[in-house]
Amino acid sequence: MIAPHEARAWDTPSLDLRSEIWLDFAEHFLDTETRQLIPASAARCVQAGLSIEEASAIWRFEVAPAVWGNLYSVAGEWAGWDREWLIARIRDARSYRLNRPGWLSNLVYRVRVHFNHGVWLAIAACMKLLKGAPESERTELAAALTWLASNYFELMPGDRPSLDVDRLTRLYCERFLVIFEPLVVTDSKRTESKTACAARVNAALKALRDS
């Protein structure tokens, strides 16, 4: 049986709108680091006027069925998807009944994506955070989250965030960690340390205070 909110979300966004979200979400199925892109993905969904339910339907039933196999490929695609190929593949995936909202497709989705479901949960949490902020502050907030994520996961942090250090620290302690700490990887391929991740952010915040 299809949940009412999933059925509504399935066909609500226009094809032009959803194709841009397809391209964005598919980045998170590449064989490369993308956790720093989570806030930007959430911001694009919010800017597009999507509800969390609509974004979830696009992630679960359109993008994941088309590109989930790349997560398990020995030599997975990492440089980026060809736009036309990706759009055609997702349109094709949408035609299969198994990829339409329902209890069975939800089960298949969880089997397919496994650990990558955590990325969606983080996108949804960032969407909720951004939707709760005044519209005029959302770009600044998304940029601050991106800066924190880049430092947390040891990537190039980019430009200095416009939030003052005290607000940035509160954002990190009160909101960021709840969203991003579950994404720290501890598996057979690599082992990250939550302590080391936190130390990088604390060092970056200290550098901002001292500058």
Go through each PLM region and give its residues.
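Short intrinsically disordered terminal tails
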Residues: 210-211
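Amphipathic alpha-helical packing elements
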Residues: 17-50, 55
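Small-residue-enriched hydrophobic alpha-helices in membranes
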Residues: 1-15, 42-167, 173-175, 179-207
